[in-house]
């Protein structure tokens, strides 16, 4: 196979729009086809031959050579107007800011406003009245709504859409944690560190549960996935704009986002959750177990690990109390708990495989995002 670009003769990347070209010429051809402005004619009798970028190139001659070498305009997908994006559905100020670095090769994402909002929630502490006579687990369950009523489908997911999901997940996790009374007695430094550690783990469990409920309500729904309260996507048809994350196309980086089998472990967790008829208390226990076990492993041997082990013990005792309060719940206690823990294990596998793919993407600069608080996005997939 030819190893040089047929247009500018630099090392080729592959076949683009019908010719063997480099990335630069492929991008030029795509822009040229999609542009609405008239192209200026050549000033040098249409005899330009050097398109390596060492001096201003003649776009007219470059386009003419692209056509001559076999590049076909009909193979370029015309940009469609963005419709039904998440920001159309949701109207609220952004707590996450996307900006370009000085060299314009990387995107800087400032989440400091979101951190400040989370800190405000933590400082407010647990809501009052907290629920007299209720266990920690029951109080945490009352703070999360897993209903998928009136869920709408989103056709396009953009960077702004992703930031809205992050905001919802981070703030929801902060409110959820404040319903655990022992959490509110921790030093604020540890509270914030735990929040920044587990918010994306809580997010995975939330989306698994919401997606399982959503799929029960729709026929032929194996591709439906809940991303935000009352909004979902179709993994087969919803468009994903990843320009905020990478310079590559979605098709080129899909593996790093979902793996070979569209995150088979997360899909397995959704399937497992769909087979269970879980109450809000049971769902909350499953979420708490996933979050605190993850944090315990991540901070093994530290004070945070000890705190997370204590929380798991408290909530396990609360779950036992919940089952023994009503003899009807104890009929398949062990079997149900086993299925719940299986779901937890699938999510943990999803986190581990995501970590491996993200490490590769970061190592080879496939992802071009830099965060103001990078510790918050460890194992988040970005």
UniProtKB/Swiss-Prot annotation:
Matches recorded under InterPro entries: C.elegans_Orphan_NR, HNF4-like_DBD, NHR-like_dom_sf, Nucl_hrmn_rcpt_lig-bd, Znf_hrmn_rcpt, Znf_NHR/GATA
Gene3D superfamilies named among the record's database cross-references: Erythroid Transcription Factor GATA-1, subunit A (3.30.50.10), Retinoid X Receptor (1.10.565.10)
Q: Which residues bind DNA?
A: 2-78
| Compartments in which it is found | Nucleus
Q: Which UniProt keywords apply?
A: DNA-binding, Metal-binding, Nucleus, Receptor, Transcription, Transcription regulation, Zinc, Zinc-finger
Q: From what superkingdom does this record's organism come? A: Eukaryota
Q: What is its main location?
A: nucleus
SUPFAM superfamilies linked: Glucocorticoid receptor-like (DNA-binding domain) (SSF57716), Nuclear receptor ligand-binding domain (SSF48508)
Zinc finger (NR C4-type) in chain:
5-25, 42-61
What does the entry list under GO cellular component?
nucleus
* SMART domains reported in the protein's UniProt record: HOLI, ZnF_C4
GO MF annotations in UniProt = DNA-binding transcription factor activity; RNA polymerase II cis-regulatory region sequence-specific DNA binding; zinc ion binding
Residue stretches making up the NR LBD domain: 110-380
Protein family (similarity comment): Belongs to the nuclear hormone receptor family.
Role of this protein: Orphan nuclear receptor.
Q: What is this protein called?
A: Nuclear hormone receptor family member nhr-106
Give the species. Caenorhabditis elegans
From the broadest rank down, the organism's phylogenetic lineage runs:
Eukaryota, Metazoa, Ecdysozoa, Nematoda, Chromadorea
């Amino acid at each position: 196979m030819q190893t040089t670009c047929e247009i500018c003769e630099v090392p080729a990347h592959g076949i683009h729009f019908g010719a063997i070209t480099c990335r630069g010429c492929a991008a030029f051809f795509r822009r040229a086809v999609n542009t609405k402005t008239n192209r200026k004619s050549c000033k040098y009798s249409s005899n330009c031959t050097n398109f390596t970028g060492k001096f201003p190139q003649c776009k007219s001659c470059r386009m003419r050579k692209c056509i001559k070498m076999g590049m076909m305009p009909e193979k370029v997908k015309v940009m469609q107007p963005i419709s039904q994006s998440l920001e159309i559905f949701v109207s609220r100020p952004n707590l996450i800011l996307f900006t370009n670095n000085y060299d314009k090769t990387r995107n800087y994402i400032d989440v400091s406003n979101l951190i400040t909002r989370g800190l405000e929630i933590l400082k407010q502490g647990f809501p009052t009245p907290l629920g007299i006579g209720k266990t920690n687990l029951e109080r945490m369950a009352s703070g999360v709504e897993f209903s998928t009523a009136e869920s709408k489908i989103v056709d396009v997911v953009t960077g702004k859409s992703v930031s809205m999901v992050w905001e919802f997940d981070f703030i929801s996790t902060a409110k959820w944690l404040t319903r655990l009374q022992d959490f509110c007695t921790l030093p604020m430094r540890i509270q914030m560190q735990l929040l920044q550690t587990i918010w994306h783990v809580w997010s995975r469990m939330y989306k698994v549960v919401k997606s399982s409920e959503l799929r029960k309500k729709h026929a032929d729904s194996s591709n439906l996935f809940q991303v935000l309260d009352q909004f979902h996507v179709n993994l087969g048809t919803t468009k994903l704009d990843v320009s905020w994350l990478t310079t590559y196309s979605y098709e080129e980086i899909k593996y790093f986002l979902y793996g070979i089998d569209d995150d088979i472990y997360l899909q397995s967790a959704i399937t497992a959750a769909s087979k269970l008829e879980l109450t809000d208390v049971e769902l909350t226990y499953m979420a708490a177990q996933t979050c605190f076990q993850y944090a315990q492993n991540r901070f093994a041997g530290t004070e945070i690990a000890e705190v997370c082990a204590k929380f798991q013990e408290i909530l396990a005792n609360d779950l036992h109390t919940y089952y023994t309060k009503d003899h009807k719940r104890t009929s398949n206690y062990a079997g149900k708990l086993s299925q719940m823990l299986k779901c937890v294990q699938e999510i943990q596998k999803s986190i581990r495989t995501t970590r491996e793919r993200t490490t590769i993407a970061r190592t080879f600069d496939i992802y071009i995002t830099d965060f103001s608080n990078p510790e918050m996005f460890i194992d988040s997939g970005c």
